Regions:
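Juxtamembrane interface helices immediately C-terminal to a transmembrane segment
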Residues: 9-10, 27-57, 79, 272, ...
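GAF sensory domains
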Residues: 110-120, 206-225
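Cytoplasm-proximal transmembrane signaling helix
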Residues: 12-17, 262-264, 269-308
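Extracytoplasmic/periplasmic sensory segments of membrane signal-transduction proteins
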Residues: 41-48, 53-138
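Extracellular/periplasmic juxtamembrane segments that couple receptor/chemosensory ectodomains to their
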Residues: 212, 218-281
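Solvent-exposed, extracytoplasmic
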Residues: 80-93, 170, 174-214
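Extracytoplasmic/periplasmic ligand-binding sensor regions of membrane-associated signaling proteins
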Residues: 92-96, 110-187, 241-243
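Extreme N-terminal signal-anchor transmembrane helix of membrane signaling/transducer proteins, especially
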Residues: 2-33, 37, 284-293, 297
Length: 308
């Protein structure tokens, strides 16, 4: 009789534990998949939010370029006496602009700081002028350089226009990025080891927690060259990569609408999967406790039905 009770106990116990284990495995697979999808969307939305904040900052701080173009498009006569005070006003009113200036196809150049070029200096050959022409009336955000006076990272933001007399010209702003970087460092959640970085449409790194990765005028660091191209590969594959600090991480990238820049959010794998791992641990604990309870019930039940 004892043998029968033992065998019945083991039989029912194996059935109960087996069913619980199968249920846990199936539940963990589907739950982990659902959590991973939710996590992906969450980090995508976070990157898109950061990108929208960058775009808002850029539009707010480069609005004077659009305003200056509108002012000049309404003018039929190019009069330095009336144009210079306007450029000076735009320069003085924007704390993030080093200067706002304008160049015309006849090589006339008017600078908002009052600077006047030497004879023979040709504004139409400057990159900000030629790049704005190539952009066809859209604002062009140039590659970064370091200002010789302030040591800050600067970009040129330029836009082509035509005056009322159909003379071509380009408005240019030299924009400091330090305030933008301060804002991004403030809003980016780094509590789990995440960080964000920014690169422009040419791939030049503008902002990165590793100062060695940031572009300057003499040394433009391209995102495709960093960590053996690991950033670009991870963006394409959506798989984890080994970061410069040796840790496995995921990344999500979002486009900054008005400039073509990219905002990239980098998150450690451990933080990325923490919710799924916590859920799996809960399932394991529940399964173990359920198995213990089932075992006790099976033993009691088997004992009752095998009594003489």
């Amino acid at each position: 009789m004892k043998s029968i009770r033992t065998r019945l106990t083991l039989f029912f116990l194996l059935i109960c534990v087996g069913c619980l284990a199968i249920a846990m495995a199936v539940s963990s697979i589907f739950s982990r998949s659902a959590l991973t999808d939710t996590n992906d969307r969450l980090h995508e939305q976070q990157a898109e939010y950061y990108a929208s904040m960058i775009d808002s900052w850029l539009q707010e701080n480069t609005g004077d370029v659009d305003a200056a173009c509108t002012f000049l498009e309404a003018k039929s006569l190019i009069d330095e006496v009336t144009i210079r005070p306007v450029m000076e006003q735009y320069t003085n009113n924007n704390v993030n602009a080093i200067n706002v200036n304008v160049g015309f196809e006849n090589k006339l150049f008017i600078d908002g700081t009052g600077w006047k070029p030497e004879a023979g200096w040709d504004c139409t050959g400057r990159p900000w002028y030629t790049d704005a022409k190539a952009a066809g009336g859209e604002k062009y955000f140039g590659d970064p350089y370091v200002d010789a006076v302030t040591g800050e990272l600067i970009i040129s933001v330029s836009k082509m226009f035509h005056t009322g007399s159909d003379m071509e010209g380009v408005v240019n702003m030299d924009l400091k990025l330090s305030t933008l970087f301060d804002m991004m460092n403030e809003i980016t959640d780094t509590s789990d080891g995440s960080y964000s970085f920014i690169y422009n449409e040419n791939g030049a790194i503008l902002m990165h927690p590793n100062s060695e990765f940031i572009s300057t005028g003499e040394n433009v660091v391209n995102v495709s060259d960093l960590i053996g191209g690991a950033y670009e590969k991870a963006m394409t594959s959506q798989r984890a990569f080994t970061d410069y600090d040796g840790k496995a991480k995921y990344l999500k990238a979002a486009t900054v609408a008005g400039s073509g820049w990219k905002e990239v959010l980098v998150t450690p794998v451990a933080a990325y999967n923490s919710a799924a791992n916590e859920m799996l641990m809960v399932l394991v604990v529940v399964t173990v406790l359920s198995s213990v309870i089932a075992a006790v019930l099976v033993i009691l039940y088997a004992g009752s039905i095998t009594k003489p």
